[in-house]
């Protein structure tokens, strides 16, 4: 058997894998276990009661967290004309059409989010093999293909998270940093759960939000007691 690292031994000693923790208790625990030399993110895994093999039960969307994610986000926007000026005014770092596409083709992708107006998709569509595998391809389902690019830029800058379930029906995303106080992390988590509930597939039966776990970038998962959350859709 592989020898446990000191970090893993500490986690095993402090985290009860059979327990669901109150959100405030969980945050205290996460802070104790966050010993990396950088400010770790707080990530969430939400197990959904869906059959991920069925396309009509897949969950995908986006929501703006009330307290953001703690990350600074660089935004690229494919658009032109008045929309280009609006995107720049909203804070987009890169705005263009064919010129921006050429940068992407060269591998110059110093951005975290890509937004496009509908008329720009003829250009963006040619970049699918580059942007797609990186999770950067604009999509109307998450609000990144939109005629209102300025609003989309503002949302991205304000701490919007995009999510989609994996093949096991689990949503993975970030709800902040470990140096956020417990109330901010709680409210961000509640906002995410409300958005997930609003997007519940009509064909999904039984318990929808089956399990919620929080972890830091380098830490173990801590199961959350949902009864202490205000997440009514």
Swiss-Prot record:
Domain of life: Bacteria
InterPro entries for the chain: Ribosom_uL1_bac-type (IPR005878), Ribosomal_uL1 (IPR002143), Ribosomal_uL1-like (IPR023674), Ribosomal_uL1/biogenesis (IPR028364), Ribosomal_uL1_3-a/b-sand (IPR016095), Ribosomal_uL1_CS (IPR023673)
Entry annotated with the keyword Translocase: no
Pfam families for this protein: Ribosomal_L1 (PF00687)
An example molecular function term from Gene Ontology annotations: tRNA binding
Keywords assigned by UniProt, alphabetized: Repressor, Ribonucleoprotein, Ribosomal protein, RNA-binding, rRNA-binding, Translation regulation, tRNA-binding
Cellular component terms per the entry's GO annotation: cytosolic large ribosomal subunit
One GO term (biological process): regulation of translation
Keyword Amino-acid biosynthesis among UniProt keywords: no
NCBIfam families: rplA_bact
Family: Belongs to the universal ribosomal protein uL1 family.
Subunit: Part of the 50S ribosomal subunit.
Biological role: Binds directly to 23S rRNA. The L1 stalk is quite mobile in the ribosome, and is involved in E site tRNA release.
Entry protein name: Large ribosomal subunit protein uL1
Protein species of origin: Photorhabdus laumondii subsp. laumondii (strain DSM 15139 / CIP 105565 / TT01)
């Amino acid at each position: 058997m592989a020898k446990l690292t000191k970090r893993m031994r500490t986690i095993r000693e402090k985290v009860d894998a059979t327990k669901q923790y109150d959100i405030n208790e969980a945050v205290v625990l996460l802070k104790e276990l966050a010993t990396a030399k950088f400010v770790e993110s707080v990530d969430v895994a939400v197990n959904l009661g869906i059959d991920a093999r069925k396309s009509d039960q897949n969950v995908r969307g986006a929501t703006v967290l009330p307290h953001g994610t703690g990350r600074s986000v660089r935004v690229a926007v494919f658009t032109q004309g008045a929309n280009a000026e609006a995107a720049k005014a909203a804070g987009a770092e890169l705005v263009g059409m064919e010129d921006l596409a050429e940068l992407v083709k060269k591998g110059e992708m110093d951005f975290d989010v890509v937004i496009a107006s509908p008329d720009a998709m003829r250009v963006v569509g040619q970049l699918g093999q580059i942007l797609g595998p990186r999770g950067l391809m604009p999509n109307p389902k998450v609000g990144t293909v939109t005629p209102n690019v300025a609003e989309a830029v503002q949302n991205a800058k304000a701490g919007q998270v995009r999510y989609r379930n994996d093949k096991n029906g689990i949503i993975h995303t970030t709800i902040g940093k470990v140096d956020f106080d417990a109330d901010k992390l709680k409210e961000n988590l509640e906002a995410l759960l409300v958005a997930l509930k609003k997007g519940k597939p009509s064909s999904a039966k039984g318990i929808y939000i089956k399990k919620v776990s929080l972890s830091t970038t380098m830490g173990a998962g801590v199961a959350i007691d949902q009864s202490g959350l205000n997440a009514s859709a």
